UniProtKB/Swiss-Prot annotation:
Top-level EC class: transferase
Keyword Kinase belongs to the record: no
Database matches in CDD domains: LbH_UDP-GlcNAc_AT
Protein name, UniProt field: Acyl-[acyl-carrier-protein]--UDP-N-acetylglucosamine O-acyltransferase
Keywords recorded for this protein, A-Z: Acyltransferase, Cytoplasm, Lipid A biosynthesis, Lipid biosynthesis, Lipid metabolism, Repeat, Transferase
Role: Involved in the biosynthesis of lipid A, a phosphorylated glycolipid that anchors the lipopolysaccharide to the outer membrane of the cell.
Reactions that this protein is recorded to catalyse: a (3R)-hydroxyacyl-[ACP] + UDP-N-acetyl-alpha-D-glucosamine = a UDP-3-O-[(3R)-3-hydroxyacyl]-N-acetyl-alpha-D-glucosamine + holo-[ACP]
Pathway connected to this protein: Glycolipid biosynthesis; lipid IV(A) biosynthesis; lipid IV(A) from (3R)-3-hydroxytetradecanoyl-[acyl-carrier-protein] and UDP-N-acetyl-alpha-D-glucosamine: step 1/6
Length: 271
């Protein structure tokens, strides 16, 4: 099949766009002049890919998606900000992903092997890692960071500048306004949709090969942070002492990741 056969005749591809010869484009899709797409990427029908957008290899973009659109930020003044997407990502129908803003690094970034379901919104300047799952209608505001292997439940909403740590899980229909430490489950409580901590993501960690010792260590750190009468600073000190007393290197590694994340919080951690 030639490249002409892989691009539907009704698609509008700007002549300055850089597309690998193996890229497939569906009917009535529009691709702007500053777009680049790597080998094996497939785009459905009625999709718009615009802005300074780079898509890596073997990505799948669903129908009616909007990728690389202008940021929804009233300070935006047509600066040439970017969206950079890695390899092997699935971006389903009606998803909107915007470029960055000059007030941040100017880049919205998405890593590799992410599963982004229908009607997801990823706003300007977000940084999404690898192997994440965004369930349908998950919405993240500007400047949000999502770590590797994190899962966002359907219809969840995340406030701007919030961080979601690696291997964390956010429950469906939850409103998140503070950081979720790595390895932690956060979900809405009874009587409202504001997210609250609900323990370590034990099942997810087991599926990904974490050891019993690592999980036990994380549970102990979680109890110090959330289930004790310690202040935040006291809990951090106790977790640091726990790390110092841990001989197992893999356990020490995950505990250090947990401790470093909570120490770096600016919005506070979910409570």
């Amino acid at each position: 099949m030639t490249q002409a056969q892989k691009i539907h005749p009704t698609a509008q591809i700007d002549p300055n766009a850089e597309l690998d010869s193996s890229v497939e484009i569906g009917a009535f899709t529009v691709v702007g002049p500053n777009v680049r797409m790597g080998a094996g990427t497939r785009v459905g029908h009625h999709t718009v890919i615009e802005g300074y957008t780079t898509l890596g290899r073997d990505n799948s973009i669903g129908h009616f998606a909007s990728v690389g659109g202008r940021p929804q930020d009233m300070k935006y003044r047509d600066e040439p900000t970017q969206l950079i997407v890695g390899d092997r990502n699935t971006i389903r129908e009606f998803t909107a992903i915007h470029t960055g803003t000059a007030q941040d690094a100017g880049i919205t970034s998405i890593g590799d092997d992410n599963w982004i379901m229908a009607y997801v919104h990823i706003a300007h300047d977000c940084r999404v890692g690898n192997h994440t799952v965004f369930s349908s209608n998950a919405q993240i505001a500007g400047h949000v960071e999502v770590g590797d292997w994190a899962i966002l439940g359907g219809m969840s909403g995340v406030h701007q500048f919030v961080r979601i740590g690696a291997h964390a899980m956010l429950g469906g229909a939850s409103a998140l306004v503070q950081d979720v430490p790595p390895f932690v489950i956060a979900a809405s409580d009874k009587g409202g949709n504001k997210a609250a901590p609900h323990g370590i993501n034990v099942e997810g960690l087991r599926r990904r090969g974490f050891t019993a010792e690592q999980i036990t260590g994380l549970r102990q750190a979680y109890k110090l942070l959330y289930k004790s009468d310690l202040s935040f600073d006291q809990a951090k000190a106790e977790i640091a002492a726990q790390i110092a007393q841990t001989d197992d290197a893999p356990t020490r590694e995950v505990l250090t990741a947990f401790a470093d994340f909570i120490a770096a919080t600016k919005r506070g951690i979910v409570r």
